[in-house]
Each structure stands twice: as structure tokens, then as C-alpha cells.
Amino acid sequence: MNKRICLLAGYDKKNVVQDYVLYLARKLSKISDVYYFADGHFTQKELNKLRHYTKYAASCPHKTYDFGSWQCLICHIGWEKIMMYDEMIICNDSIYGPMSNMEDIFDYMDLRDYDFWGLTENYNSNYHLDSYFMVFKKDIIKHPKFHEFWNNMMPTSNRRIYESVLTPFLTELGFTGNSYIKNYKKEDQLAYPLRLFKTNRMPFIRVNTLKYPAHNLKEPILYIDTRIENETGYDADFIRKHLESEGLFEGFGLSYYAKKSFYAIKNKFSDWVH
């Protein structure tokens, strides 16, 4: 197995390390050395939850999103140490999972001999790999221009800017990248979580897909938590607890939005009847 380092970026508006994040870190620690950095004021007690799964866990409010947390970790670890690894993973906690064997995905992508890869690809604004999970091989890790990209990163209010430029930046340097799941329809792939799992054993579900289903989910929402658990084997309590902590979920497989819509329709119908 290749020696991997994983830079895990975190954020929680209540400065809590959620259970689903602990599970994510635990699974990532099986395939890599995990370093965690959160944007916020996390207490040491919260960060200590990660002590069994990470080499380092810290937090600081920097307001530069995931790339800011990854930059902080790179500054802490140093390129000399990072270059000792065969692969560098960047990952954030905007995903539930994993729901499938990550080593199988690494084996599959290793056969294709890419210099960098992600799980999904995106055509918004320009073609790029989604940065919630990306992998960089040794030649990129050692490249001075890659170091400059991270070292020279500046604060920005555009949370997508660095994600959208990273893929073309590496391509212009002569590196070859691709996605594990191809997006031939140029659609929002992550809006179809169960389809992606069935067809590609997609290991993750985007948090915002379930957090804001009215805008981000294009599959039936009723009992989505139970269906996820039954079809993927992932403990849906991680999802329920997280969304409940956000005030967006009320059990029985109905999101806040779906339940709100249901009662709105019910009240409207009652008005008509009376």
C-alpha cells in the first residue's frame, strides 16, 4: 500500500466534532496518516475526540474555507515531511461516509496511472475536479509550483475559486488528472447519491444534498435516511444526529423541508374543505 497523508478540513457552526466526522476520520486513518484542522474555535475537549484517528488536530478561525485549513496544515507539517509520502489526500467534512471500501477505489485509480484524481468532476464555471476529496501523487507533491500554489494562497470571499483553478493549474503543468466517476451529462452528480452508490460504489454523500434537499437532492426524499442505511450499510444515525443538531431533521425519514411542505399542503387542503 502506498504511504499516504490526508489533510482533513473541518467546520461546524457550533464548534463540535460531529459523530459522522469521527467516523470519517476513523476510516481515513485506515488508509492514511490523518491531520485535521478546523475553521473555528473548537475546544481542546472537542479536538481530543479525534486523538485516536489523527496525528494532529487543531482549530483556528481563518474564514478562508477548506483551502485555508489545508494551507494551515501544510504550514504546520512542512513540505519536507509531506514529500516523504507517496500520495497526498485533501478531504473535508462536507461528506457523509465512507460507504464503500476506499482501498478498492485507490486500486482502481492506481491502474489508470493518473497524477491526480478526484471522485467526481464539475462543469460549473469551468471543468474541474470536486475538491471534497482529491488525491495527488508523488510527482505533484514534489513539484515547486504545487508548493507555490499553497504557499501563496490569499484570503478570499469566493469559497470556490481555488477549487475551480486547481485542476487547470495542474493540467497546465503537464500533469494528468481525472475523476473516479465520469460526468458525461454535465449534471450535478452529487444530487443523485443512491444512484451513484448503486452504479459506482460512490463512498460519500454530500452533506448539503441532505441538508438542503429542496435544492440539492434529485431523488425521492421520503425515508431517504432508511434507504441510505439499507442500500449502503452506512449507519444513518450519523446523518440524523448531525441534521438534528442543525435543526433540519425530524426523524421518520422526512427532512425539515419535506415535512414543512407536507403540513403546508395539509393546511391548504383543510382550508379548502372548510
At which residue positions do the language-model features occur?
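ER/Golgi luminal nucleotide-sugar-dependent glycosyltransferases, focusing on the catalytic module
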Residues: M1-H274
